[in-house]
């Protein structure tokens, strides 16, 4: 029988005693408040960067006690243990809990100390589909996780290979983030190949900042092939060392062939003004593309011009991020002209350009574009604000530009959009 919140509150002290660890007070408080209110606990958020846990982060033993108490839960759907000190032993306990807690849907383990062995245990849980002929028993020994974040853990190639193996049989997972995990080309290739060959249920994939030493961009080919054949809608490939050749491969074999890609994050790569022609192709041929992040690629003016010419042909692009792309005033003007030439209803509603060089002409073009878009009922939210400054001492009126945060309710969140 599935455990209720009252059962969890009764089980946790014994679990702490068995694990020989102190109780995590924010968890105790959440359980107590729910029981006192006669309510059921549906989420547990124990982020180690929070004020309550900053100086007392959850370690492996603490995670084991929490996992033991949550095993078999019928109410808790989300568990956030990000930015703690959970090791492989803690991950093993969490994996055992996952295999016996079909109510659990979202697990956040970002920024911990989980290595290849712990990743393999989590992968085993993801691969579990029930092994009993009895329906009730099978349901209690299967993992129904939909979202898994393990970015910022030292998983290595072996950890990603284990998770890739699980993806071949898992049918519940919709979101996976394994970025910044000390993995190399073997690990990222294994994940891409597994999705390409055997997985059509994953929707969001993050694999940023792998340890790559190749100059051939063969890893990009595997990502492109995966995009073309899978149901992935959101893909994060930041710091993948994608150059002009790599972006050409991604555009021609991946985005152009994908029927569902909505969010593509290519920040901090090596895409230059030559590669911008392929970016323009992505904008024109990505019929479902809503979000494109090109932050910190050296596109320069020529790259900005190529992208600007493609913008009127974009189908669904809602947000474009080109911060710190070495764009001078000519490129800034070209981007304003490109959006102005786009039908108002199809213009991006969020544009990020801070970190580039706004000249006086570029400021005036963008000031006019922002005002005109607002007048026709299609406002553009930018990460900068342009303000006319009154002329003084006979000087000509000029425009001032300053940084501005884009409101959360306006921005397209690349991770939650799917």
Question: Each predicted region: which residue ranges?
Answer:
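Leucine-rich tandem repeat or coiled-coil scaffolds
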Residues: 1-418
């Amino acid at each position: 029988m599935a455990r209720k919140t009252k059962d969890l509150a009764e089980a946790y002290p014994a679990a702490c005693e068995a694990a020989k660890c102190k109780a995590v007070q924010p968890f105790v408080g959440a359980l107590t408040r729910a029981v006192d209110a006669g309510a059921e606990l549906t989420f547990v958020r124990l982020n180690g960067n929070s004020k309550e846990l900053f100086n007392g982060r959850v370690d492996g033993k603490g995670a084991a006690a929490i996992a033991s108490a949550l095993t078999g839960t019928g109410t808790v759907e989300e568990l956030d243990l990000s930015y703690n000190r959970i090791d492989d032993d803690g991950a093993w306990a969490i994996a055992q809990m996952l295999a016996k807690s079909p109510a659990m849907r979202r697990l956040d383990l970002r920024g911990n100390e989980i290595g290849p062995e712990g990743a393999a245990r989590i992968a085993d849980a993801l691969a579990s589909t029930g092994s009993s002929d009895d329906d009730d028993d099978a349901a209690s020994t299967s993992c129904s996780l939909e979202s898994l974040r393990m970015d910022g853990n030292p998983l290595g190639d072996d950890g990603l290979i284990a998770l890739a193996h699980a993806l071949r049989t898992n049918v519940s997972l919709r979101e996976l983030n394994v970025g910044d995990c000390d993995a190399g080309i073997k690990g990222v290739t294994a994940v891409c190949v597994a999705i390409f060959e055997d997985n059509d249920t994953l929707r969001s994939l993050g694999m940023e900042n792998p340890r790559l030493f190749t100059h051939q961009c063969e890893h990009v080919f595997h990502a492109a092939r995966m995009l073309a054949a899978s149901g992935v809608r959101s893909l994060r490939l930041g710091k993948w060392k994608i150059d002009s050749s790599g972006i050409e491969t991604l555009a021609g074999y991946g985005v152009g062939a994908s029927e569902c890609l909505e969010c593509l994050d290519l920040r901090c790569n090596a895409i230059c003004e030559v590669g911008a022609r392929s970016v323009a192709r992505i904008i024109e041929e990505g019929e479902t593309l809503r979000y494109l992040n090109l932050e910190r690629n050296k596109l320069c003016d020529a790259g900005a011009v190529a992208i600007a010419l493609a913008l009127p042909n974009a189908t669904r692009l809602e947000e474009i991020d080109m911060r710190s792309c070495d764009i001078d005033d000519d490129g800034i003007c070209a981007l304003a002209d490109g959006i102005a030439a786009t039908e108002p209803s199809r213009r991006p509603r969020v544009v990020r350009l801070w970190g580039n060089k706004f000249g006086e002409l570029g400021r005036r073009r963008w000031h006019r574009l922002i005002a005109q878009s607002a007048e026709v009922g299609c406002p553009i939210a930018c990460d900068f604000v342009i303000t006319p400054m009154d002329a003084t001492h006979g000087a000509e009126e000029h425009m001032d530009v300053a940084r501005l945060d884009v409101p959360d309710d306006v921005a397209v969140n690349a991770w939650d959009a799917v």
